[in-house]
Structure formats: C-alpha cells, structure tokens
Amino acid sequence: MDDIKDMPLHKPVMVEEVLDYLHPQPGHIILDCTVGGGGHAIKILDKIKPDGFLIGIDKDMEILQTTKQSLSKTAGKFKLYHADYSDIDEVLRQADIDKVNGVLLDLGVSSLQFDQADRGFSFAKEAPLDMRMDRSCGITAQNLIRRLSETELAELLWKYGEERRSRRIARAILKEEKGVGITTTRQLAAIVERVVPRGKGKIHPATRVFQALRIAVNKELENLEIFLDKIYNYMAVGARIVIISFH
C-alpha cells in the first residue's frame, strides 16, 4: 500500500484559468467541492486572505488528513469536511454559511488517488478492484460487476464510458466472473484487452471500461446533478462556479 503522506504535493491543473474565472477576492467565501490534495485551495486562500474563508469538501478522508496539514501552513482561514458535494446543503449548514462567492469542482479521479495502487483506479498497477473514492462506504467495482446482468453492464459501459464494444466486453467480463472470478485491476484489464486488442498509438482498451466503472461506483453524474440543483440557493450576487472536467 502506498502511503499518501509520503507522496509529493498534488499539482493542480489549470491553476491560472481557475483563478481567472473564479476571480477570488479578499474577504470572499469560496467553496472547493473537490479539495483533494489542496492544490487549488492553497492558491485560492492566498487570494482571499486575510478575511476570506474557504470551505473544502472531499469524500476521500485519507486525502483530507494530508490536505489539512498542507493548508495549515498558509495564513488563510479554512475548514474541511468529509462529505460528497451532493450534500452541500448539510455542509453549509454545519459551517453556518448562507451564501458563497465562488464554487470550484474538479471532477473525476485525482492524480493522488490514481497513484495509490491499492485504490484500484489504475489498470497499470495490480490492486483490488475497488475504485471507491470514499472507502468507508459504498460498493466496490468488484461487487458492482457481480450484481449486474450482461445487459446492465453493457449499458453502463456505453453510458459512462462511451465504449462501442460494450456488449462484447460485458459478455467476456461476466463469463470470467462466473468462472474464476474477477478480483484485481490487471485481471479486468487483461479480459478487455483480449476482446479489444490495443491499436497502435491508441489509448489502452481498458481505459473507457475503468472510467465507466469508476463513475458508476462513485455515482459521479448523479451526485453532480443533485449538487447543481442545490448550489444556486447558496450563491451570492455575482458569484461564480468553475467546473473542470476531462470527459
């Protein structure tokens, strides 16, 4: 198991763009809904100090423990919450905050999570087929596969991964599951690779499959819809929302 405390500081993506569009100012209250390793949060705190306040949310408790140490080294005021951003109303109630001036979401899996082999997000490393961002609750990718029919799995791979060969892949996965069983990342990747040979210069055949399973396991799109329905009730006049997504 890789210890997250020993990993290098997470380098946030599109920092200048985030600061430009979010436009944090001294005294602002900013909501970082996927605070992760704190890369964006540190930059935001520098812009809103001394009287601003940052609320950081993440469903990954393991990352939050390290992030708190990193943010404590700044002069900014902040509070971190172990929660999903779909529970934003409860988080803001606990923080006693009515309105915010800015909101940031960096969707998907972080590089910190990806680099932790035992999390199961990467097929490049042998690991249990987990994929949960919050390992204290929810269903693992391994158990999700066991619960689905061939049709359901194929639909999931198409809906969340836009995988054109979803039915062939689903059939091969469930055949293996009913036989020897599927318990690890590389085992799953090998099954997909047998069905869809890797083309020259193209992404690994299992990329879309892993993406689809991760999105389903963590209910990423459902939680995003819930969040977007709620957040406008807490936006101050002139507030901004910045969402980063790569798929």
Place the predicted regions along the sequence by residue.
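S-adenosyl-L-methionine-dependent methyltransferase catalytic core, i.e., the SAM/SAH-binding region
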Residues: 1-247
